[in-house]
């Protein structure tokens, strides 16, 4: 302590009621103090976006270099941070995150939220369309500038739209008790990809979970990181149930892990109870612990 006092590293107050504090210099810290104001000409950002998307597609965009600078300041201690922007606009934040990851090797992720606000632009119906297209083109641009000596960064993204549930709401009033409609509890016109996303959300599975897709009997078979399999095919007979069970077992055994494996199927996908029971028995015999249906 005496040495710190002699070096001027202890700041004392005007009297004994003020607690002494340790003096630390900026070059001794792992983070930087954020400047209250810094200036950049926003016309440069407009020119870069015009070159990327076409002239005048999105006027007065935020500067991706400025946003990257702010993100760097708050994520430098954790380059794997998740960045959220509820007003995506032209997609500047996502572009900034990809640029920053390319510059420092970070693995930051981003979530962008944008209303489908209509726009009158050639080739674009909504602002969200512009957002997605900018991310696609920025991804290609960044990849083209990467050195062959550096590991490629992940610039991919997934796009989701807010929609009603794939599962029909239950209404027990007499005028709604249509037995023919009740046979299938899933909304019409939905794809197996739609079912997969809702299943992931309901089960708490991250949407960024690695996904592989195969095919069995003409319907997709989904593999989520080897711990969750999903098959939403229809008209599943006993023979087809055995075929699906064999495909699931073979795929799981390609890279067996210690985690428990769950299988999710479409409840109304089986032609009868015998096919469903046969499928469950085949999975149990193969060592699958959990079978769920939607």
Would you name each region that the model predicts?
Residues 1-82, 104:
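Class I S-adenosyl-L-methionine
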Residues 19-21, 45-47, 90-95, 103, ...:
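Flexible loop/turn segments at secondary-structure boundaries
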Residues 64-141:
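Conserved S-adenosyl-L-methionine
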Residues 139-152:
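Short mixed-charge
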Residues 154-169:
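A conserved beta-strand->alpha-helix junction
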Residues 170-183, 192-193:
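Polar, glycine-rich mid-to-C-terminal structural blocks
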Residues 202-221:
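Conserved helicase/translocase motor-coupling segment
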Residues 206, 224, 230-294:
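Long, compositionally biased intrinsically disordered regions
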């Amino acid at each position: 302590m005496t040495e710190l006092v002699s070096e001027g590293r202890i700041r004392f107050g005007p009297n004994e009621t003020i607690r002494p504090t340790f003096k630390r210099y900026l070059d001794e810290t792992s983070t930087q103090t954020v400047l209250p104001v810094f200036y950049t000409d926003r016309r440069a950002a407009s020119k870069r976006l015009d070159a990327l998307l076409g002239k005048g597609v999105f006027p007065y965009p935020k500067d991706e270099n400025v946003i990257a600078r702010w993100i760097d300041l708050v994520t430098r201690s954790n380059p794997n941070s998740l960045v959220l922007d509820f007003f995506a606009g032209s997609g500047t934040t996502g572009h900034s995150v990809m640029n920053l990851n390319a510059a420092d090797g970070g693995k930051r992720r981003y979530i962008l939220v944008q209303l489908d606000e209509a726009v009158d632009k050639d080739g674009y119906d909504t602002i969200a369309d512009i957002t997605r297209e900018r991310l696609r083109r920025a991804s290609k641009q960044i990849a083209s500038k990467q050195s062959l000596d550096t590991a490629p960064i992940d610039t991919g993204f997934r796009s989701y739209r807010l929609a009603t549930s794939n599962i029909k709401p239950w209404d027990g009033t007499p005028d709604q008790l249509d037995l023919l409609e009740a046979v299938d509890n899933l909304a019409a016109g939905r794809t197996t990809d739609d079912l997969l996303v809702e299943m992931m959300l309901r089960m708490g599975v991250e949407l960024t979970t690695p996904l592989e897709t195969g095919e069995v009997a003409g319907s997709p078979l989904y593999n989520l990181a080897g711990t969750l399999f999903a098959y939403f095919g229809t008209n599943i007979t006993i023979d087809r149930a055995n075929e699906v069970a064999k495909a699931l077992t073979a795929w799981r055994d390609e890279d067996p892990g210690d985690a428990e494996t769950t299988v999710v199927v479409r409840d109304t996908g089986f032609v009868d109870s015998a096919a469903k029971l046969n499928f469950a028995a085949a999975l149990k015999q193969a060592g699958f612990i959990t079978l769920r249906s939607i």
